[in-house]
Amino acid sequence: MSAVEAPSASQAIWPELTEDHPLSQLNSRLPTILSEAGHSQIWGVTLTYSTPPTFSTLIILQKFLRSVDNNVDEAATALGKTLKWRKDWGLDAPADKKEKENFGPDFEGLGYVTKIKKNDGGDEIVTWNVYGAVKDLKSTFGDLDRFLRWRVNLMEEAIAHLHLATTSTPIPDFNAGIDPHRMAQVHLYEGVSFLRMDPHVKAASKATIELMAANYPELLSRKFFVGVPLIMSWMFQAVRMFVSAETAKKFVVISYKENLANELGELEGVPKEYGGKGLSLGELQNQLRGEDAVTSS
């Protein structure tokens, strides 16, 4: 099978694929997967079957393959389920027909999406979950469906900034290199009591973890838990025992919020209260939205 050219940059090509390559095998199943799901859109990409495969389709297929160690059967099943889920949730409706949901004051200040310059010089999208901003636990977490829609909305905004449909950078095969199309995630626990676990919070946390694991594979590069009391850091160490080594490597526990900037990246992209030199989270988010608006116009 010939090398695949990126539609947005003719000079960028995907490494040549053999007929028995996992990507080639998964691509050959696309007609059935798309037909059974009744849906073909995901993360800004419209999946299409062709030989050779389109560059953006390979980006999506590679993420699903890497998430299951190149098991083609498992990747095909997972992709089909995710496409059906996205159809049911109406996540890929055209912008002019998609109503922007207003989640109200219960979610104000709880989530942000920004961009930083990593220590290695590359850009990275960051999602911020500010649990200390919750005003009323029941109002925010009590309606599980509404909470999950809010959390998915935050994730979808972050993914949009990855520009998966137009990238010209391929994803290496499983165990052959780092996926460059991922984001960091910061969980801020300042002001949160670790001594009691509200049942609504527990249910929302469990449902969110399951939903994200099933429908958003290979999208996180690093996961920071900030403001965790030293006495509770053992809990996160224990969690490492129950997840894969690859997932555990992404966990970074930080007890003092001022130490976050040194771990995350360039100081100008991190607010001052977290050890950086940047603007507030809201201002950094608006800055990113403005940059993308100019780029897409």
UniProtKB/Swiss-Prot annotation:
Belongs to the SFH5 family. It is a peripheral membrane protein. One of its GO terms (biological process) is Golgi to plasma membrane protein transport. Non-classical phosphatidylinositol (PtdIns) transfer protein (PITP), which exhibits PtdIns-binding/transfer activity in the absence of detectable PtdCho-binding/transfer activity. Regulates PtdIns(4,5)P2 homeostasis at the plasma membrane. Heme-binding protein that may play a role in organic oxidant-induced stress responses. InterPro entries: CRAL-TRIO_dom, CRAL-TRIO_dom_sf, CRAL/TRIO_N_dom_sf, Sfh5. The keyword Cytoplasm applies. Its cofactor is heme b. Residues 106-282 form the CRAL-TRIO domain. It is found in: Cytoplasm; Endoplasmic reticulum membrane; Microsome membrane. GO terms for molecular function: metal ion binding; phosphatidylinositol transfer activity. Keywords: Cytoplasm, Endoplasmic reticulum, Heme, Iron, Lipid transport, Membrane, Metal-binding, Microsome, Transport. The keyword Transport applies. CDD domains: SEC14. This is Phosphatidylinositol transfer protein SFH5. Pfam families: CRAL_TRIO (PF00650). It comes from the Eukaryota. Heme binds at Y131, R151, H187, Y189, K223. GO terms for cellular component: cortical endoplasmic reticulum; cytosol; endoplasmic reticulum membrane; plasma membrane. It catalyses: a 1,2-diacyl-sn-glycero-3-phospho-(1D-myo-inositol)(in) = a 1,2-diacyl-sn-glycero-3-phospho-(1D-myo-inositol)(out).
